Amino acid sequence: SMAGLFPEGKEFNVYCDTPASRVVAERWPTEIIFSGFEIGNMIFTGKKLVQMDVKDSPVKDAYSLCFAEGDPNGRMSWDLTAVLVAVKGYEPYYNVERGTFRVVNDEGANSWTPDGKGKDLRLIEKVPAVEMAVLIENYMMHQPVSK
């Protein structure tokens, strides 16, 4: 899940619906792997993608709009880190810490308590952000093979 700011803070995906975030944090029946704001914030992607000679790409078109609005070095990759881990797993890209995620107030601030018996994991940078940007952007630029 792309949610939270670690070890504590306030992040949009939590505070945009604090009651729902609290319910998920307290009642979700399985382990949640949190990719916090700090993980994707320094991973800039999209610059090479928008320069590709490909037409009718909704991903390229969306990134082109971001660049037009002032992201000349690329777009932060918060959600993309969560997708990468969901598809490929966190190894070898990230270390993890086990603990408990909590929504601590009605404004949607969160906290993290490290605990070897906690039900959640949070990602911790292992591969430098610049290398992660190359890896993620290469996946974004992949073109389907024609049959």
Annotated model-derived regions:
Residues 15-19, 23-26, 31-147:
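Conformational coupling and interaction surfaces
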Residues 1-9:
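Class I SAM-dependent methyltransferase SAM-binding "motif I" and its flanking Rossmann-like core
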